[in-house]
């Protein structure tokens, strides 16, 4: 698989094969600028490579139109973006429940588990925040960076997507918040059986994963299959 930003000659991902099994939890490490976020964006269908194959939950993203990729991502992928990508004028609850507005599958999963989408969102948020800390009706623009990161995490987990993609999901969290997030993440993985791709510079939780993949190896790989 070949990919370059703005058709530059410096290819971020190049030649080989990467396969992640269903239910596997993979910790991806690498130096800054090694292409970790780019790889996650390719796997998540945010960008497409100039050449190669990216097969996710039975779909070759390279063969799908943009709207088709959006549909697969909405139904099957929970993405914790490095920049969070929250909608600032929506409330905390509205941001967390947003995936269930775009995906009937995730909406049905949330309702089956918790009785309603709101109850599912409240459960996730109460695992990440001290109960009663503040109203979840506040807009996300009122939150600190660390608080926003927790909202982004809850949004990715709601509705039990088959694949969780986490790009530096604890970078802005203090120790207690980081431990609360990791506890919730692995509880949700145990419940849903989701596959996890997790990028971080922090090796503290590396031992929790089935496998550690280094970008120095991944950069020699061409096909991605999950």
Regions found by a protein language model. Give the residues of each.
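Conserved catalytic motifs of ABC-family nucleotide-binding domains
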Residues: 160
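Catalytic Walker B motif of ABC-type/P-loop ATPase nucleotide-binding domains
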Residues: 164-167
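Conserved ABC ATPase signature
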Residues: 139-143, 147
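Hydrophobic anchor residue at the start of the ABC signature
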Residues: 153
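Conserved ABC transporter NBD signature motif
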Residues: 52-60
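ABC-family nucleotide-binding domains
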Residues: 174
């Amino acid at each position: 698989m070949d990919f370059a930003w703005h058709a530059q000659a410096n290819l971020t991902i190049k030649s080989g094969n990467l396969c992640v099994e269903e239910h596997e939890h993979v910790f991806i490490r690498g130096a800054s600028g090694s292409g970790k976020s780019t790889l996650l964006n390719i796997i998540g269908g945010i960008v497409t490579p100039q050449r190669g194959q990216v097969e996710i939950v039975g779909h070759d993203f390279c063969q799908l139109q943009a709207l088709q990729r959006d549909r697969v991502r909405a139904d099957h992928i929970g993405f914790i973006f490095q920049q969070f990508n929250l909608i600032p004028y929506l409330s905390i609850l509205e941001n967390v429940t947003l995936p269930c507005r775009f995906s009937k599958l995730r909406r049905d999963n949330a309702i089956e588990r918790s009785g309603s989408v709101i109850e599912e969102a409240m459960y996730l948020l109460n695992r990440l925040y001290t109960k009663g800390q503040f109203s979840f009706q506040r807009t996300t623009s009122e939150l600190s960076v660390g608080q926003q990161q927790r909202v982004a995490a809850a949004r990715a987990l709601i509705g039990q997507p088959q694949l969780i993609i986490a790009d530096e999901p604890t970078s802005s969290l203090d120790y207690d918040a980081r431990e609360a997030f990791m506890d919730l993440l692995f509880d949700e993985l145990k419940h849903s059986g989701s596959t996890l791709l997790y990028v971080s510079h922090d090796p503290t939780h590396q031992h929790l994963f089935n496998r550690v993949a280094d970008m120095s190896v991944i950069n020699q790989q061409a096909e991605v299959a999950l």
